[in-house]
Amino acid sequence: MTSLENYIYNEITSRYADFDAAHREDHVSTVISQALELLDRMPSWLQDHPEARESWDLPVDRNVLLAAAACHDLGLVNGRDNHHLDSGKIIRADERLKEWFDTEQIETIAQAAEDHRASGKSAPRSIYGMLVAEADRVIDGETIIRRTIQFGQKHYPELDREGHIERAIAHLREKYGRGGYLKLWIPWSDNAARLAELQDIIADDTAIRNKVSVIFNSL
């Protein structure tokens, strides 16, 4: 393990332990592994899609991507509303990162964290932001529904069972439903097919209510 990896895995990811259940250490570990996997898959996709080389054949520093993925949600320490912007501030203020990165690289890491949020209206400013944003959007129906419910339980404790189910369904439709605000950025990601499957469930009123109810009862 390199000194950077030691810092990331022993000091950065541990900060997620105090966040809500949907954004704890398992979440950041998944985002890190997914971001690096997407990077590793890029060359073979470019080989199969030579017409995309002009847009996508970009140099990517693996360590910069690792740091961006690891730090993307650190701003949750101040709450969710502006966590992407707060993550950028925390990254820029981290003196330890200067041991491995220059000022430009740290700014790239900070911008990737700022740009990862699904509700953002603009595309990420760099391929690092796109990779982190895509990795943060791991499309697994059960995981998404569980995280949605868990977020509601933490932030809306006054709701009863039916209230939590209704809130979860409304959020799923707004974010993941057809025409929802979630955007995917990496064309070689598996997320598009998985999102289509989830959208089929969300579009079926009975199916989505049953799915949310079953997962709610399991928590």
Model-found features: residue ranges?
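Intrinsically disordered, low-complexity activation-like regions
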Residues: 10-11, 15, 114, 141
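Divalent metal-dependent phosphate-bond-processing catalytic cores, especially two-metal-ion Mg2+/Mn2+ enzymes
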Residues: 17-25, 29-59, 71, 118-219
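Short helix-to-loop capping/linker segments positioned immediately adjacent to catalytic or ligand/cofactor-binding
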Residues: 78, 97-101, 119-123
